């Protein structure tokens, strides 16, 4: 039975802050553009300017159901936590891949190796996915924070909605009919272990535990063949929380198919099997034909008997009634037509959207060519980028450095440059590559005397190693951050840098998560004129931003300055006319297009920030950020106060008990989607284990 979506709920933003800096202007521009029907726009916001708050204000003021996409689970979890705080009275949902572990089905012809699909589903995330889809069909005030997994097939929203079991007090329906209806939407009867997606029966009382809940269930009480009343109960204690006048029970799976559709689907699968067997046999692929026939007939038998089979998603084209090549249903189809999409870190996320389809296709083609799957399995896939675009009603790309794709989609760019702390983008200068190491040594000594830190980025592993060795010979306290270093070690290195155990961190890629250090006042980029992934415009801007947390922030780009530009040389004059040059000691030298654009953009932002600070009497202050010792572990005393525990003073048995306790807390934090807290607890556990 279909249900009506409640459309009169409003978003209610709860925050103790008012828009600061240029947030107010950015918010009003974005809202005005949306209300004027602008399809795509970019929020180009510098790091640390409060882009999530701006996004929240835009959602609240436009009132549109919104999909917020991020490029990984960790970032999605952080955004989800922030939006939950901003909108405690609205439906803020979380939709990411529910696999803790996932090994996709694959075949490697070179070694004749078939790898069966193997996975482990996270029950908590599965619950949140069900909560997201049910909220989207029930109400309008919904924000769904999702990873790119939201463009993967999910089942038909119409079948899902039409399968809803709708109950009201006074409704005429027999108890047995309700039980049949619940089984029909994939609920299981379990009178002993009552959990999500189950129901239990006690005389004239049926208790239902929805797939989207984790603590509360519903008790349906019958009087003959009529529902007497419906109560919400706490699962653990059985305590009645209140009565409800309507209960919509959504299916326990997103992949719903009624009996008639199932028979149609099986007939189509059989027809496709017959056609594909003819193709294989005509090509002399008898092994492939036998394999396909055996596997598919087994799946058909399972579908007939159980309504389900292993890898049922590979038959989704037939189950959904789609034509060959048609896009699958995804989370996007559950939204109303006028919904809004916000893409966080769009320069990363849109690249993922583009790449998902091709990677999936290559793996599935191998399975189909060798008789492991029917060709229709190719239509169990993520959306292509063009198909994703066809779902877009209105979209906001959010990034400090928008990608080429976003820039091609729209000319409407809204900027957010002012940081509430008053911090400026750093001063950037270019210096010659000749003598760069000695020059850098001098700069490092200046920073060390002021108790400040330095980042040095190189292009190759060998150069990083050689540079680190040279600095050590010169008496500089230095460490090298390379790709083999694990997360925990990286955290330790950053902590030691902040504490002043060493002054200089050398690395190739210093753009990873968690490497924002307020004590860093100098970033030196060696070989800045060598175009590539970390020396393109976006890479340079992001690396330059590492010095933007310190009021003394300074960046030096070391570049080849072997030959000054000569205005009388036609080739040099062309470079001078293009503007891709810099001045050093009265002479002009060629620089790359990326360097020029990164420097110009940083200078432009800095000028705007300085003017704002001057007008409002703001003095930039370096961010004060607590330095947490990994070994410092706190526990609650009997009085409820926190006290620090010295792990090194514990014996082995005490540490083992503490590890057990922390692991439990880590799992609780992960279940509550506090991924940062869970990661900190994990690091503590690893540290404690390393001590024994």
From Swiss-Prot:
Species of the source: Lactococcus lactis subsp. cremoris (strain MG1363)
MF terms in GO: ATP binding; ATP hydrolysis activity; DNA binding; excinuclease ABC activity; helicase activity
Residue ranges of domain UVR in the record: 656-691
GO cellular component, one term: cytoplasm
GN (gene name): uvrB
CDD domains, sorted: DEXHc_UvrB, SF2_C_UvrB
Classification lineage: Bacteria, Bacillati, Bacillota, Bacilli, Lactobacillales
Protein name: UvrABC system protein B
Family: Belongs to the UvrB family.
Biological processes per GO annotation: nucleotide-excision repair; SOS response
Record note on quaternary structure: Forms a heterotetramer with UvrA during the search for lesions. Interacts with UvrC in an incision complex.
Ranges for domain Helicase C-terminal: 436-631
């Amino acid at each position: 039975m279909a249900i009506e979506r409640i459309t009169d709920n409003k978003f209610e933003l709860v925050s103790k802050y008012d828009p600061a800096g240029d947030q107010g202007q950015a918010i009003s521009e974005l809202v005005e553009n949306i209300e004027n029907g602008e399809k795509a726009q970019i929020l180009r916001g510098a790091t640390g300017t409060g882009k999530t708050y701006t996004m929240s204000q835009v959602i609240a003021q436009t009132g549109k159901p919104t999909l917020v996409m991020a490029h990984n689970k960790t970032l999605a979890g952080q955004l989800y936590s922030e939006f939950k705080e901003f909108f405690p009275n609205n439906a803020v949902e979380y939709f990411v891949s529910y696999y803790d572990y996932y090994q996709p089905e694959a075949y490697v012809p070179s070694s004749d190796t078939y790898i069966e699909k193997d996975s482990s589903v996270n029950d908590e995330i599965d619950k949140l996915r069900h909560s997201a889809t049910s909220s989207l069909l029930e109400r309008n005030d919904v924000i769904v924070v999702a990873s790119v997994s939201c463009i993967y097939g999910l089942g038909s929203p119409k079948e899902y909605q039409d399968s809803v079991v709708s109950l009201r007090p006074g409704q005429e329906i027999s108890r047995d009919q309700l039980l049949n209806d619940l089984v029909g939407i994939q609920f299981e009867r379990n009178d002993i272990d009552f959990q999500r997606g189950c129901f239990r029966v006690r005389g004239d009382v049926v208790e239902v535990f929805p797939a989207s809940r984790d603590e509360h269930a519903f008790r349906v009480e019958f009087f003959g063949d009529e529902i007497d009343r419906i109560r919400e109960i706490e699962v653990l204690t059985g305590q009645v929380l209140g009565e409800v006048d309507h209960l919509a029970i959504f299916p326990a799976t997103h992949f719903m198919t009624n009996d008639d559709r199932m028979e149609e689907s099986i007939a189509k699968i059989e027809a496709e099997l017959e056609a594909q067997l003819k193709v294989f046999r005509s090509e002399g692929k008898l092994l492939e034909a036998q394999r396909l026939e055996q596997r598919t007939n087994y799946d058909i038998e399972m579908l007939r008997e159980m309504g389900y089979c292993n890898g049922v998603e590979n038959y989704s084209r037939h189950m959904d009634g789609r034509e060959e090549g048609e896009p699958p249903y995804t989370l996007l189809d559950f939204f109303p037509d006028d919904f809004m999409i916000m893409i966080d870190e769009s320069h990363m996320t849109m690249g993922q959207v583009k790449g998902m389809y091709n990677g999936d296709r290559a793996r599935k083609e191998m399975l189909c060519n060798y008789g492991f799957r029917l060709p229709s399995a190719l239509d169990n896939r993520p959306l292509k980028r063009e198909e994703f675009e066809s779902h877009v009603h209105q979209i906001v790309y959010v990034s400090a450095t928008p990608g080429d794709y976003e820039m091609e989609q729209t000319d409407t760019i809204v900027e957010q440059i002012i940081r509430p702390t008053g911090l400026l983008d750093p001063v950037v200068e270019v210096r010659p590559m000749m003598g760069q190491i000695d020059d850098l040594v001098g700069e490092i000594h200046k920073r060390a005397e002021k108790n400040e830190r330095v980042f040095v980025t190189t292009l190759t592993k060998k150069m990083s190693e050689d540079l680190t060795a040279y600095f050590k010979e010169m008496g500089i306290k230095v460490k090298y951050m390379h790709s083999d270093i694990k997360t925990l070690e990286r955290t330790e290195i950053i902590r030691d840098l902040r504490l002043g155990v060493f002054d200089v961190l050398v690395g190739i890629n210093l753009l990873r998560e968690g490497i924002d250090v307020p004590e860093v006042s100098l970033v030196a980029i060696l070989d800045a004129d060598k175009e590539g992934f970390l020396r393109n415009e976006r890479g340079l801007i992001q690396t330059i931003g590492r010095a933007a947390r310190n009021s003394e922030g300074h960046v030096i780009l070391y570049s080849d300055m072997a030959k000054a530009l000569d205005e009388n040389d036609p080739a040099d004059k062309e470079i001078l006319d293009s503007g891709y040059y810099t001045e050093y000691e009265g002479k002009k030298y060629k620089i790359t297009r990326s360097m020029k654009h990164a420097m110009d953009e940083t200078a432009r932002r800095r000028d705007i920030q300085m003017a704002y600070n001057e007008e409002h009497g703001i003095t930039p202050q370096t961010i004060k950020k607590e330095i947490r010792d990994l070994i410092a572990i706190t526990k609650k005393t009997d009085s409820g106060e926190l006290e620090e525990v010295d792990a090194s003073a514990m014996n082995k048995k005490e540490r083992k008990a503490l590890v057990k306790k922390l692991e439990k807390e880590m799992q609780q934090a992960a279940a509550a989607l506090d991924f940062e807290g869970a990661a900190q607890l994990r690091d503590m556990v690893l540290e404690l284990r390393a001590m024994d």
